[in-house]
Amino acid sequence: MNNCIKVVPIALRCQQRTISTSSVLEGKRNFRKFNAYNKRGTRVVKEAQKTLANPPVAIHKRGVRDTGILVDGQYVEIPEKIPDIIVPDLTGCKLKPYVSYKAPDVVQSEFTSLDLFNAVYSQKIIEDFKAGKLQKDGSAKEPSVNEQLTPEEALQRARKTGSDIF
Amino acid sequence: MSSALIKCLNLAKTVGNATVRSFLAAPKQPWQSCSAAALQTPHVQMPMQMHTSAVRRDLMEFFDDKKNWSENEVKVGRAWRTEELRIKSNKELHQLWFVLLKERNMLLTMEHECNDKMEVFPSPERIDKVKISMENLETVVRERNKAYHLLETGETGERPQKAVKNAFGLQVSYKACEHALPPFMNLKWIKSRNIGYGGRAVNRFLLKYREKLYNAKRKAKNRSRNEVMMILRRNPNFDLDVLRRQFPDVNVDKLRNEDKIRGHYVPKVGV
């Protein structure tokens, strides 16, 4: 019995389970495998990100555009680069994101340049024709603001900042 | 030089601030749409006005109505169709765009939160409906933009497209975009572009690719011909005009003279 009592600790120690792992890899050694964005990485990496003109990892801006530039390490804000989001007044807006299934069907063809011409120009041309205010080539003697618009001005007006580009 | 540039930029910033202040001090006027087609309608150029939605100091607009949180299904209507959007004015389209944008943000926020909390996100098809509505709205805006450009300048106003060949020798459509530098000064682009494609591997790939396309076409033609053959074999008195209209690729007259359309029966001779 005494022999058994003496052997018990050895037996228990033999029955214990152990695990083993590989050596821990510090960040400094295998830097390329880590995604070290703006605030991640070691202290040295963060310092380099902050100070270098071309940091080792590009600054992750999450899709947001800059509103200024760096001049000799000094950030200068440019007013033209600040986006001007034009939001309509939605108070009293009756439009909803979905359309009821009971809504009546609408039949409407595509809006063409002929429709735009009829909406803007044709009324004045008819009136000028009746009043005899047209020249021989068909242009008006007293052109309106829209008739004085040249193609270049129209293109400039349409291509202002914020317009859609398809 | 750099200090002078900094002074110029700071001066520009000051002018910008003054402009914004003058904008805010301007009397309130109804907001005018910036769409290209709407620029034609007002006869006087309105000054730029700014508007914002009502101020709410919390983020609960990003979440759905509280009574919908534990529901399994939220009943909503369908997406906006193109015909319905065409009868709306530019102002209404602008408002609708932001209504849909808020709805999309709310739906994405709820989806993300439901995933975090291991809950069921009710009616996920709402995201698709909002996406379809936004696509249709952009289609209508594009139509009006094209109409304006065609009327005033004679061109569609859209980006010019060019057919170029990619690295595999396949033809793709390239849409031109604006660049700050002219091509001969753009060193990065000059270094990165590869002029032409080539190599034996590309040629072999193109041969196999064209063979694949040709095989698909050949099999489709054979399938059509076999279908006509079986129709005529089972129904000798089938209307040939219908067959010609339905299968334009198949030579029906030539097929009638062949033995392939003869069925497994003895032709009836005049008794």
Swiss-Prot record, chain A:
GO CC, any one term: ribonucleoprotein complex
Q: Which InterPro entries match?
A: Ribosomal_mL41 (IPR019189)
Recorded GO MF terms: structural constituent of ribosome
Q: Which Pfam families match?
A: MRP-L27
Q: Where is this region: Disordered?
A: 136-166
Give UniProt keywords alphabetically.
Answer: Mitochondrion, Ribonucleoprotein, Ribosomal protein, Transit peptide
Q: Where in the cell is it found?
A: Mitochondrion
Chief location of this protein within or outside the cell: mitochondrion
Q: Which biological process terms from the Gene Ontology are attached to this UniProt entry?
A: mitochondrial translation; translation
Query: Where's the transit peptide located?
Result: 1-26
What is the top-level taxon of the source organism?
Answer: Eukaryota
Assembly and oligomerization: Component of the mitochondrial ribosome large subunit (39S) which comprises a 16S rRNA and about 50 distinct proteins.
As for family, the record states: Belongs to the mitochondrion-specific ribosomal protein mL41 family.
The cross-references to PANTHER family, in alphabetical order and at most eight, read:
LARGE RIBOSOMAL SUBUNIT PROTEIN ML41 (PTHR21338:SF0), MITOCHONDRIAL RIBOSOMAL PROTEIN L41 (PTHR21338)
Q: What name has this protein been given in UniProt? A: Large ribosomal subunit protein mL41
**What is the species of this protein?**
Drosophila melanogaster
